[in-house]
Structure formats: C-alpha cells, structure tokens
Amino acid sequence: MIIKRDYYLQQLISSKSNNLIKIVTGIRRSGKSFLLFNLFHNHLIETGVSEDHIIEIALDDRLNKNLRDPDVILQHIHERIVDDKLYYIILDEVQMIDEFTDVLNSLLHIRNADVYVSGSNSKFLSKDVVTEFR
C-alpha cells in the first residue's frame, strides 16, 4: 500500500526554488526517502524536469560510501551540473556525510541548484544544525 503523503509533498512543492535547503526529518523508516525519491521525483518529471537535472544520492547505500567524503560528494555534484538550467539535488540520510553542514553550505552557493535533504539521527535533528544556517 502506498501512502501518498499529499500534505508533505505539497510542502516541498510550495518551497521549490526559494533559495533555501529543504530539510525532511523524522525517525528511520518513516517514509522520508519515499517522499523524496518517489513522490517528489515523480512530481518533478510530471512538471517537465528532465531526469538528468535531478541528482539523487542515497547516502545510506553502501555503493555510495565514497560520497560520504565532503570533497568527493561536492565534486560529484559539480560534475553532474553541465548547464545553466535548474538542477534538483536530493540527498538522503545527509548526516552520513562527514562535515555535512559544510557540504550543505557549499551547495547553497550553486546558483542553479535547488537542494532537498533528509536526515534521521540525533546529530542531524539537533537544534545546533539549525544555527549553522543562520
């Protein structure tokens, strides 16, 4: 059974291109990844966004372990951005990146990027993270 999560999807849609990082938080296995990688991804495709302008990285996937290095993930993302059109960057379990707040701050400097992240542990949910973006 698929739970549509219309309310949360609408929150993401209404926050598109606002020059802020959109953060989806919650306990593990609560549907954050499904919301971003399926529901929001499908919305982007349905509204005309090209697949190659959606950069999705699941950092809890062992195959992406090398991308947990801040320099490696930033280089990977920059290599995928090849034109001036808007790119949607979706990072799942972002707290698995070393120095993830520095990475997120760096992503804010990409003019043609709209950034969405999820996280689920106490390190990511800490109020201290919020102060990093003031």
Residue ranges and their predicted role:
Residues M1-R134:
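Phosphate-binding site recognition
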